Amino acid sequence: MTQDEQQIRDLVRTWMEATQAGDTETVLGLMTEDVVFLVPGREPMRKEEFAATARAQAAPGGPRIEGRSEIQEVQVAGDWAFLWSRLRVKVTPPGGAAAVERSGHTLTVLRKEQGRWRLARDANLLA
């Protein structure tokens, strides 16, 4: 495994751990300023909207988020890379409401900025 691939795998691990811990600032630091998230049935989401949603979810009384990412492939080409993974997410709302579980694949494009890999584009196919 190359150093770049290891750094990308570490980014995904950090993302998952920070999301589950409600550490929005760490998650935001793992993405580029021009990041775009693509989700079926919705308009593309930019960093500002992602940040607002993530902060609301991480606030006291927000849902509990659990997840697991299984990276299937990582390819690096200079300062760009992509990965595809299988993602499982469970969101448990406060107050005893039923949890929502989703799973599916993601395709993620990363860009290396100032020596660090950051998420630049993400297509989430969870159902």
Regions found by a protein language model. Name each.
Residues 5, 11, 24-77, 86, ...:
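A solvent-exposed, acidic/Ser-Thr-rich amphipathic alpha-helical stretch
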Residues 103-127:
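Short beta-strand edge/turn micro-motifs at domain boundaries
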